[in-house]
Curated annotation (Swiss-Prot):
GO molecular function, one term: RNA binding
EC number: 3.1.26.4
Record key words, sorted: Cytoplasm, Endonuclease, Hydrolase, Manganese, Metal-binding, Nuclease
Biological role stated in the UniProt entry: Endonuclease that specifically degrades the RNA of RNA-DNA hybrids.
Cofactor: how and how many bound: Manganese or magnesium. Binds 1 divalent metal ion per monomer in the absence of substrate. May bind a second metal ion after substrate binding.
Main location: cytoplasm
Protein name: Ribonuclease HII
Co-factor requirement: Mn(2+); Mg(2+)
Positions of a divalent metal cation binding: D16, E17, D108
Cellular-component GO terms for this entry: cytoplasm; ribonuclease H2 complex
InterPro entries referenced in this protein's UniProt entry, alphabetically: RNase_HII (IPR022898), RNase_HII/HIII (IPR001352), RNase_HII/HIII_dom (IPR024567), RNaseH-like_sf (IPR012337), RNaseH_sf (IPR036397)
Catalytic activity as recorded in UniProt: Endonucleolytic cleavage to 5'-phosphomonoester
Organism: Flavobacterium psychrophilum (strain ATCC 49511 / DSM 21280 / CIP 103535 / JIP02/86)
Alphabetical list of Pfam families matching this protein: RNase_HII
Length: 219
């Protein structure tokens, strides 16, 4: 069973991202503050849950959370500052959107979420000095496999995954030949064959190796 809290029982937020390894679409992050009495026998790392279970959990998390937020960062930003920095920035933006501001943050992963070097500038997504001050004033811990250890991170994992899946289902209608409704932008054989046949779209990440034999995709 997942633990409720890491250090404190008051306003501790969990945050996680989805879509880091995809060839197309945004990286999506979520942050969640759960109440002390939140319980769930089925909540776990979103990767361990079926799509049906994730969809069942989404409205429950949204209804019972003290606060939650979701952020998408598009491929242009991913290409500009790289996927690691984009993932951190998406989680940072989610933390800023929480109301009330959490007293502690736990993030899935092994990289410091709020270190001085993590606030990468990029086009259209520059934190103000005040926002950076707010983020740096909140103590945080990054926890490897945190989404399978703590309820708040698992809840964030579910929201990030379900919101990103909805986004990919929407853009699938614009470019159905890539079958994003099924592969969600991940590097499946089918997705790469579609890239080879039809080329790339505005939703593809140009700094990723979109085709295995290419170091840089020919445009």
């Amino acid at each position: 069973m997942l633990s409720s809290f890491f250090l404190t029982q008051h306003l501790e937020a969990g945050t996680d991202e989805a879509g880091r390894g995809c060839l197309a679409g945004p990286v999506t992050a979520a942050a969640v503050i759960l109440p002390e009495n939140f319980e769930s026998k089925i909540l776990n790392d979103s990767k361990q849950l079926s799509e049906k279970t994730r969809e069942q959990l989404k409205p429950i998390i949204e209804a019972l959370a003290i606060s939650f937020s979701v952020t998408h960062l598009d491929p242009l930003i991913i290409d500009e500052i790289n996927i690691l920095n984009a993932s951190l920035k998406a989680m940072q933006e989610c933390v800023l959107q929480l109301n009330p501001t959490p007293l502690y943050i736990i993030a899935d992963g092994n990289r410091p979420l709020l270190s001085k070097n993590s606030f990468k500038k990029c086009s259209g997504k520059i934190f103000t000095n005040r926002e950076i001050e707010i983020l740096q004033s909140i103590p945080s811990s990054s926890i490897i496999k945190g989404d399978s250890k703590y309820l708040s991170i698992a809840a964030a994992s579910v929201l990030a995954k379900t919101y990103r899946d909805e986004y990919m289902n929407t853009i699938h209608e614009e470019f159905p030949m890539y079958n994003w409704k099924k592969n969600k932008g991940y590097p499946t054989k089918e997705h790469r064959e579609a890239i080879r046949k039809y080329g790339v779209t505005k939703y593809h990440r140009m700094t990723f190796r979109l085709l295995p034999e290419q170091t840089v995709l020919d445009l």
